[in-house]
Amino acid sequence: MSIDRIKNYHLSRRKFLASAGAGAAGMAVGVPWGAQQAFAAGLGDKELRTVGLSVTVQERILNDFKAKSGVKAVSGKADIFPNTQTELLAGTSAYDVWETIGERLPAVIATNKITPIATSAMKNWGNIRDTFTKADPKWDKKNQIVGQIWKDDTQKELWMVPTVYNYDSIGYRPDLVSAEEASTWTALFDKKFKGKTGLNVDPLIAFGEAVLAMNALGLLKVPNPGNPDKASIDEAAKFLVSKKKDGQFRALWGDFGELVNLLASGEMILADAWQPAVMAVKAQGKQCTYAVAKEGYRAWSIGNSAITGTPNMDAVVAYSDYWLSGPPAIAVSEQGYYSPTTNIKSAMDKDKYAFWYEGKPWKGATDRGIKEGDLRDGGSLETRAKNVAYWHQWPDEYDHLIKKWDEFLSA
């Protein structure tokens, strides 16, 4: 992939996610909410203008919210996080809510571009998962999602209301690579697979994975791969450059279709992958699996942040509360992500919930390559949550990391 294509890869991913999301959302619309439906009254004079990735900014979801909330208008723009962050820092007033990712919150909090949302204003908040309210002793609080989203330790106001999260890993071809070989981040850099591995073009992803691998190989000892210091960034950059020059990578991928095609063809047999991409390869009738890396998963969460000065704050709160109910939670779950609320259990078909969340066998007709008796790769949500290496976070040495990433791209 050329540098120009790397800079523009997000567009193709958005196109895919828009189409995939529309299908999933379509299945969700019309699901009864029962006691979980809860909105502020008197929204008829409000509108909801949102911006974010197409993972969450989906037309069918917005239309369903409009119908159920009574807001007079909704609009959504799909764009990548850096672009929106630049717009916000420049002072745009075009949006009411940014559907952002936890790791980017520090930049907009420090510049007063977002305002917190009170949990007391959301009737569905009571069923949020412990992941977002209780710190895991495995990491410092600030290095996990619970330390990113709250205004303070009273946990009464949120900088970001979580709506989607997942644990990312390695996608591989089990007919060409054994499960044992693929069960480590070092596999992406193993000479045995020279010319047949793929590396994501997002620098925060690539550097974290390189650090995970180097830790496993005894080349580094970085306790928090999501926030390496300058010296560790320098070593990881040297490692990445040497692998690139040796021809280790079949592709520096960012385009969803490219990833799927390369894995399906066997030109690339290992890659750091999005789980929906692995499903897309399986849907073509090819063997493809999401690995359980011994070093652990990369964890992340997307959610709603209210933009400071919005004239539609009540609509933002209602939209955030809506995300903690049935239809949107079902839509993202059937794409292969997780909903942060336990409300999903009563809203989703019980057999589908059992497959996506509880590690139970698939029941019913084949769907996107998932056949009767298949299990979700990695097992249940509980099992996967216990195997997280680190949560994505904003690195202290972000500028230095980006400088070294540019050197890698130019090598």
Where are these regions (language model features)?
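N-terminal secretory signal peptides
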Residues: 1-15, 25
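Conserved C-terminal helix/tail region of periplasmic/extracytoplasmic solute-binding proteins
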Residues: 5-7, 372-411
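Extracytoplasmic ligand-binding site segments that recognize negatively charged/polar headgroups
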Residues: 82, 109-258
